[in-house]
Amino acid sequence: MSMEAPRRGRRWVSLGMIALLAAIGLGLYWDQLSTPSGITPATSPRRAEGLLLGRLPLPMEPSLLSPLERLLEPPLRYKLMTIRHIPPVKPGTGMPHPYVGDCIQCHLMVGGPAAGSQFKTPYGAVLENLSRVRKLGPPILPTSRQPHPPAGRCIKCHDIVVKVPVDKKGGMRWQL
């Protein structure tokens, strides 16, 4: 009898160790089940949507939460504003509008090159001269691509159209 008592104790210890290892393995497996498809707490909503739907939405495409965001935050109302004249600016002054590109693409610089000194092709020079009577080009956005050879500053032939908020409480910010 004295020989069987230690064996019975070893059996319980070995069964306890096996049960403990099984519980640890089941816990690790359960942890993997609780995060489906690799979604972790650090996953962005865009990546989570891609994992769930099988593709990533485009940057300008509305997300799954966009309808809710639109309900909570009323959209800003904008009106169109046509710019027919662009004033010269001093180098180093603040920008009164969002960044569109290099200042010299639209503005003349005070103390800089004179008007008409921008590079233009002979065809562009003819277009610029014809636009002195009446602007030949259609209204364009500040971010529009140039569909013709260089012809000096865009404002000479085109009116520039921007969207300006109707409610100016937050300051005058363009929407391009």
Curated annotation (Swiss-Prot):
Any single Pfam family the record assigns to this protein: MCR
GO cellular component terms attached to this protein's record: magnetosome membrane
Sequence motif MCR 2, location on chain: 140-160
Localization: Magnetosome membrane
Induction entry: Part of the probable 18 gene mamAB operon.
Knockout mutant characteristics: Cells have a weak magnetic response and make magnetosome membranes. Magnetosomes are about half the size of wild-type, but nearly as numerous. Deletion of this gene with amb1002 to amb1007 give smaller, elongated magnetite crystals, does not alter subcellular localization of MamC, MamF, MamI or MmsF. Deletion of genes mamH to mamV (amb0961 to amb0978) gives cells with no magnetosomes and no magnetic response.
Superkingdom as given in the UniProt entry: Bacteria
Function recorded in the entry: May play a role in magnetite crystal maturation. May transfer electrons to balance the Fe(2+)-Fe(3+) ratio during magnetite formation.
Entry protein name: Magnetosome protein MamT
Organism: Paramagnetospirillum magneticum (strain ATCC 700264 / AMB-1) (Magnetospirillum magneticum)
Source species taxonomy: Bacteria, Pseudomonadati, Pseudomonadota, Alphaproteobacteria, Rhodospirillales
Gene field: mamT
